[in-house]
């Protein structure tokens, strides 16, 4: 049984491949290419700043090679402007052969008129004897609205309604190496080319035109925690990890870093995770970690997911 695939996150794909592709390659019989894609999963994560996210996913095989996925969830950013609580809708599909796999995933986050974000991601993987090399491509379009403080020209400040937009494309590569029978190492790097704009939505309000103001854009868009990292606009990101697998238990450690768009500083995290097959068809995956960002400081976070495959 495979773990869930989270849209827009290449790191989840890498961890999944590192944990389950190697043993699949050593089976005496040859299972369908979409073996392990019939499951339902529920997972959540939270940190000590009250940032939270919950996501449930249903995956179903189609024929012998393809599969489709759908998910719903909710996140809450404790330090985001206005206490943002977007709902999450995800969808995905994939097709796999003996050595190649193609996936397409999309996600949409929305909190009324305050926040909307759409991500589309595709990956093409080459697999051989538990080793994986892949190419990732992404597209993002996000918009956030709220009140921001601007100089009023009289030595003080005033709050005005404003709107920030971020859009652009990204490309990345990822890979996994089966170092020994029990040890896998994996990693990923990505580069995104984003364009951001911030504008005042009420021309009659004091403060003048906001124009291209990255500080205000970051204040509106948020995304400064590991939990809501999927909402952060990262110009560059990288991840490296390793896993050790026993018969029914796998333990992995990861280090992730990224550079926030428009000079927003760095985000970093270290995480220790486990995947435990507790009963036929059932897997639980707890995790703990520590993250930091130049905007949000240090946080401790934890995660837990449960997956049932049949």
Task: State the predicted function of each range.
Residues 1-39, 63-67, 98-99:
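Cleavable N-terminal export/targeting peptides
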Residues 26-80, 301:
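Short glycine/proline- and aromatic-enriched beta-strand/turn motifs that initiate or cap beta-hairpins
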Residues 40-46, 70-74, 104-108, 135-141, ...:
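Transmembrane beta-barrel strands of outer-membrane/channel proteins
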Residues 42-44, 75-79, 107-110, 121, ...:
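Extracellular loop and loop/strand-boundary signature of outer-membrane beta-barrel proteins
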Residues 50-54, 83-89, 114-120, 165-171, ...:
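Residues that define the transmembrane beta-barrel architecture of outer-membrane proteins
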Residues 64-70, 97-104, 130-135, 143-144, ...:
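Repeated loop/turn-to-beta-strand initiation elements of outer-membrane beta-barrel proteins
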Residues 144-161, 197-227:
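Solvent-exposed loop segments that connect transmembrane elements
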Residues 244-246, 276, 297-310:
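Outer-membrane beta-barrel "beta-signal"
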């Amino acid at each position: 049984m495979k773990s869930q695939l989270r849209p827009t996150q290449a790191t989840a794909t890498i961890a999944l491949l590192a944990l389950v592709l190697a043993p699949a390659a050593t089976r005496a019989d040859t299972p369908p290419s979409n073996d392990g894609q019939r499951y339902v999963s529920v997972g959540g994560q939270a940190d000590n700043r009250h940032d939270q996210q919950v996501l449930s996913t249903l995956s179903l095989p189609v024929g012998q090679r393809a599969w489709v996925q759908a998910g719903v969830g909710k996140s809450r950013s404790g330090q985001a402007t206005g206490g943002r609580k977007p709902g999450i809708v995800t969808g995905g599909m994939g097709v796999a052969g003996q050595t190649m796999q193609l996936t397409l995933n999309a996600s949409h986050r929305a909190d009324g008129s305050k926040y909307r974000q759409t991500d589309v991601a595709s990956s093409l993987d080459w697999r051989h004897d538990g080793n994986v090399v892949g190419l990732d491509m992404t597209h993002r379009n996000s918009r956030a609205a709220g009140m921001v403080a601007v100089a009023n020209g009289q030595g003080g400040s005033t709050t005005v309604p404003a709107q920030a937009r971020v859009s652009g494309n990204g490309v990345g590569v990822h890979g996994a190496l089966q170092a020994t029978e029990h040890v896998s190492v994996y990693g990923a790097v990505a580069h995104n080319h984003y364009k951001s704009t911030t504008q005042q939505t009420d021309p009659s309000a004091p403060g003048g035109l906001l124009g291209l103001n990255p500080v205000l854009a970051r204040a509106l868009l948020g995304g400064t925690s590991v939990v809501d990292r999927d909402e952060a606009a990262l110009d560059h990101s990288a991840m490296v990890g390793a896993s050790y697998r026993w018969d029914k238990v796998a333990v992995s450690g990861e280090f992730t870093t990224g550079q926030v768009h428009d000079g927003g500083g760095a985000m970093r995290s270290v995480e220790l995770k486990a995947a435990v097959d507790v009963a036929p068809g059932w897997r639980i995956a707890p995790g703990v970690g520590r993250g930091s960002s130049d905007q949000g400081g240090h946080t401790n976070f934890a995660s837990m997911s449960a997956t049932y495959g049949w």
